[in-house]
């Protein structure tokens, strides 16, 4: 008697999975993140011979007013923010494929925190008719975003000399030292002067210098 054996193969769909990436960093400083991808079955891993790309197949993506994303062959995404951008840029989508060619995506979302430089005002006291000096000090708001030493300090209006009728004249040196040369008969507190500097992002910061003259 013949025996018939029926064999039916069931092929289960394999769906790869992914984990999104995030990062946080200071204004003006590049950040990196690496979304991760897993094969949906041990026998069908992610295809390491196919380099990851962004969703449209590119490896670079610029977002006007926000910054630029690039992706490395190992899947690390770098976001280089515009100097003045703060907040969350549009996230970027990374695409990979498994050994079956099945696509899987994940996002990378950086957060850029505002960096605000700080300053300390300067004062001085001295006798009538004698020039005085003071040096307001400035500090970057983050160790990665220092004061820009390639940009010389100026007064608030961009000048390096300021005369005040009946009081005297302020000048500022490249190192930020302010000198006030008083009119011979001036006594008391002249109008203070405001000094301006910028950090590496171009963010301005100001401080004042206030001399005092005793009779």
Question: Language-model features: where?
Answer:
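Extracellular interdomain linkers/hinges and stalk-like, low-complexity segments
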Residues: 1-45, 91, 99-146, 192, ...
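Surface-exposed or secretory-pathway low-complexity segments enriched in glycine-proline
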Residues: 3, 29-76, 80, 130-177, ...
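Surface-exposed, short loops/turns at beta-strand junctions within beta-sandwich domains
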Residues: 83-88, 184-189
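Hydrophobic beta-strand core residues of beta-sandwich domains
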Residues: 23-25, 71, 124-126, 172, ...
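Short, conserved beta-strand segments of beta-strand-rich sandwich/propeller modules, principally
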Residues: 76, 89-93, 177, 190-194
